[in-house]
Amino acid sequence: METLKKYYTVLENRTGIWLENDEIAYLSDKSGIIQVWKMNIHEKKPVQLTYYNERIWRLEAAANHRDILFSTDLGGNEQEQIFLLKAGETEPVNLTDDGATRFNLGGTNAASDMVYFTCNRRSKPNFDICKMDIGTREITTVLENSDNMNMPSSVSPDGRFMLYNKLKGMSDNRMHIVDMYTGESRDIFPEGSFAQYGSPAWKSDSDGFYFTCDENDEFLYVGYYDVATGTVRHVYHTDHDVTKVALSCDDKYLAMVVSVDGFGQFRIMDLTKGSFISCPVPPNGFIYTYAGMHWSPAGHKLLFTFSSGSRPTGLWVLDLDADAVYALTDSELSADIRDRLADPEARSFTSFDGLRISYLLYKANDNPDNPTIIQVHGGPESQEFPMYDPLIQYLVGQGFNIAAPNIRGSIGYGKSFHHLDDVEKRLDSIQDIACLARHLLETGIVKPGRLGIMGASYGGYAALSAIAHYPELWSAAIDIVGMSNLETFLENTAPYRRSHREGEYGSLANHRDVLRKVSPIHVAHRITAPLMVIHGANDPRVPVSEAEQIVTNLESRGISVKYLCYGDEGHGIMKLANKLDCYPQVVTFLKAHLL
């Protein structure tokens, strides 16, 4: 499995932020786990700044562009703590130091002597708006909340306002603005209803901000909020999601990312003219929207994270002044696997009710005997993106095809599509997977007996459901941190997550019958395919009891189950040593049952 190791030791560099003097800080797994690094963009000599055994979750620059704020947890438990690394110092300071509380980092005030965040210190299911005096470590509660999970999204340049989202659901996260001096909070679109908001980009004078939302629309569009008047105006709309915006520091250029079947496209608007400009473009692939996108403090360099099937995740720069786009970081990709990497082809099929479903196909070659694996993304309010995945790339190199669908319930195809799997409609998305399987068989991409399925989180739930409801289609399945019983999942997930997850799956108070009906544990007697189950013991999202239930059920009936549980992991396998233990076993399992 030495070759597989080369795929997993390719560097992931992402989430870049600008510091002073053309320096950036960013996240990289060069040490084997995601840590904070920095480098000068001209010298390109990376320097490691943190040395923890746990991954870094969030990274922000202080308002002074010298100090760095970040968060990490313990063993994947997601009880994030906020750390400060001051310029010129080598030892970060744990500002919060309360392992019983989760702190969601917001940012700093203009003087960089106060840090803003939300936390559930007062009440574990709820997140209050708070600020801390960095000098004294005194925490002040600005606004108490009793409505579950409130996530900070941005702080105004003058430090007066913080924006935060109220997560009623992953796609129902109304944005609020809170005055950090007075505690006054208001919904930026009070007459609105069910919608998602994100990616705020403040003007330098703090008078307002650009953002994305799908209020009263099928797709995410760009709006502008005026703080003084409390009004919203439309800026840009298209028949695809605008997933990210970023405003240059001189307020001249507004960068937007438009997602078409998961492939990112830049649109740059010159706000002084109200029109788009031409600009160099990166290769065809995925522009990470959740990993940040930032303009340089001086000039017009846009720092972003990019990946494709054949290009591992790295930091790139779009330099408008130089009319150039280029990779900034090195993935250290081994020369002997560089030419093996495959980019996917965007395809589609028609599901049981006539709905068009898109999928990405990574094809090994034209050999009709190649096994094929359907990989289902998590979320479910997420999307399959054309990005580097070490397991996919290795399997393709070993002669496997990978089909990665965006079944109903995925984002990126409109709000109506997004909600076609809610609550009692859950199994319609599983029927989409069965239709894809039959499509692959009918088109000759795979032969009977050579089809498998795998997925993580919701994708793990989907894999379990597919092999239970359509057992005749599958010869192997892999469930990674997936739910086997939606009822017990909601009962045992972290208290602050329950409410916004109930918006997707149904509530314990009103939908227990539905939750039982759509849970694979209750139809597990139909499962015949060999199964591999992988989980982290500290998972706060999908408790390890979800894995234990399905493993115990199948083993009691003599069904082949291989179970891996990692004591120092949470919701996913993040540490290199564990990856190098886990994924060779995944490959061995798939080869044994599909080749």
PLM segments and residue spans:
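Structured, non-catalytic alpha/beta "coupling" segments that mediate domain-domain communication
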Residues: 294-295, 301-321, 484
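Active-site-proximal cap/loop segments of hydrolase catalytic domains
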Residues: 407-595
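Structural motif
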Residues: 32-37, 77-83, 124-130, 171-176, ...
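Multi-bladed beta-propeller domains
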Residues: 1-14, 39-57, 75, 85-102, ...
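N-terminal cofactor/phosphate-binding cores enriched in small/glycine residues
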Residues: 15-65
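Residue-level recognition of a conserved intra-blade site in WD40 beta-propeller repeats
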Residues: 18-19, 61-62, 108, 155, ...
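Cap/lid segment of the alpha/beta-hydrolase catalytic domain
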Residues: 331-449, 456-457, 490-499
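Beta-strand C-termini and the immediately following turn/loop, strongest in propeller blades
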Residues: 20-31, 40, 49, 69-76, ...
